[in-house]
Amino acid sequence: MSGSSWPRAVFERIHTVSSDPWGVGSRPYERDKYRHTLTLLAGRRFHHALELGCSIGVMTARLARQCDHLLAVDVAEAALAQARRRCAGLEGVTFYRGQLPDDFPDLPAASCDLIIISELLYFLSRADIARLATHCLRVRQAEAPIVLVNWTGPTDTPCDGNEAARHFIATCLAAGLQVTYARHHAHYRLDMLGHVAKADYQ
């Protein structure tokens, strides 16, 4: 692939070929990723959360238990159709189709107290990663965490997972945020941005 962000048509085609092209509902890697992400957020309740890159809604269904309102975004209508079915019985969950960062949801400034971006950034160009970070900073409440989950294995995307995370984090650091949590697991990295006195690294 080139350095350009992947277009919507690619994701629609991928989800037409397979109902779960990333194995988000079956792979041990995915279960481990969900577990660590939710552990990071354990004990917290969120009023307005934003999930970018919700795919078929596996993480959405789990995250919804901690949220009064959850807006889940994906580029592929085929993926969102599955996500809607999966989350049909859950209150407060809304889905939105958009090609990020161009179609970022029209949300009020400082309206989200949690933003999660999972397995999305490396499909974007470096310029689009910076634009997405700017959008997130605008809608983020002052104390809200931004959580990044990125696959770090080989990929033919515009950036690999580590590069994508670094570019997003750099934009946030320039705006005054700090890395409050960073862990590198076997196949993915989990980062959280916010405001604290001391970052937690391992």
Q: Model-found features: residue ranges?
A:
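A conserved beta-strand element that flanks and buttresses the S-adenosyl-L-methionine
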Residues: 116
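Hydrophobic adenine-recognition pocket in adenosine-nucleotide-binding enzymes
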Residues: 120
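Class I (Rossmann-like) S-adenosyl-L-methionine-dependent methyltransferase catalytic domain
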Residues: 1-52, 56-108, 124-202
